[in-house]
């Protein structure tokens, strides 16, 4: 298991493999499963993340009605063209808020690394997908890379 970023970078250079590939190999070894099973699970996680973003951007409210709708309002503001920061950064923020609002409404999210911060990774991926039209394979590599960095945090 990865214990430092230095270790990840060294191994990546030594084996001439991207970090995402090292993480896939580690998952196979640790869990005794096939590559296909690892990729299938991560694809499901990605789909859950992106569905939560879309649901939240459409506007959801918590069961109590105390929270919700902020992601949709932020997206409407972004679309108005009045932001001085531009849309790229705010699209990520809106997606992160959207995920957290789905969580507050008891909807399905991928709690990575925790439910409280579950919007960060989907927010980043959503913003990059919008800006650069990245394909699903690239998004999955991003998730595996983030997972490797998560191992460093967990192991320290």
Region spans (language model):
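Generic N-terminal targeting/processing segments that precede catalytic cores or assembly contacts
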Residues: 1-107, 131
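Alpha-helix capping and helix-loop boundary segments enriched in small/acidic/polar residues
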Residues: 83, 112-115, 137
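Alpha-helical support elements that line or immediately flank enzyme active sites
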Residues: 122-134
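A structural-propensity feature for long, helix-poor, extended segments
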Residues: 147-156
């Amino acid at each position: 298991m990865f214990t430092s970023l230095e270790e990840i970078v060294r191994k990546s250079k030594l084996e001439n493999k991207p970090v995402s590939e090292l993480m896939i190999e580690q998952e196979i070894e640790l869990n005794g499963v096939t590559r296909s099973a690892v990729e299938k699970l991560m694809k499901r996680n990605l789909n859950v993340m992106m569905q939560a973003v879309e649901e939240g951007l459409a506007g959801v409210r918590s069961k109590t009605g105390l929270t919700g709708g902020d992601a949709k309002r932020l997206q409407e503001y972004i679309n108005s063209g009045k932001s001085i920061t531009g849309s790229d950064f705010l699209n990520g923020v809106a997606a992160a808020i959207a995920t957290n609002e789905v969580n507050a409404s008891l909807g399905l999210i991928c709690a990575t690394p925790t439910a409280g911060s579950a919007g960060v990774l989907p927010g980043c991926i959503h913003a990059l997908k919008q800006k650069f039209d990245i394909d699903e394979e690239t998004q999955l590599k991003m998730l595996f890379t983030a997972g490797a960095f998560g191992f460093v945090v967990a192991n320290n």
